[in-house]
Amino acid sequence: MYKGILTTVGGPQNVWKEITNFDGRKVTMKLDPEPSQKLINHSPDGFQWGYGGSGPSQLALALLLDVTGDSGLSVALHQDFKNNFVATWGESWQMEADEILRWVQLRRCNEGEKSEEVEL
């Protein structure tokens, strides 16, 4: 589970990732923007949400990268993911990794249908 709560007006916001540890206990950790910034550095300051800017782009890329582990796929889909989700979030939000994976799978299916239509 990923979640965020606005803590300041403007500026970077923390995003939290809740995972189940090897012993079954839930652990909450901060999502690090650095891996996504190494792919595309939209926002050197970090994450934001609720509008269509650079901070939300960084968050969309980071979420996709963290969930899928696929840098190419994450780069290709992050702007659409931002527009569909991140830009619409209010003061607080939460999203399960499974929801993100379902969205990715749906996008990949839709893209496959489009390319099949072009080939015919």
Which sequence ranges carry the predicted segments?
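Long, low-hydrophobicity ectodomains and other hydrophilic envelope-associated domains
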Residues: 1-16
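Short, compact, well-ordered microdomains
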Residues: 67-111
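Amphipathic alpha-helical packing elements
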Residues: 13-82
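Short intrinsically disordered terminal tails
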Residues: 1, 111-120
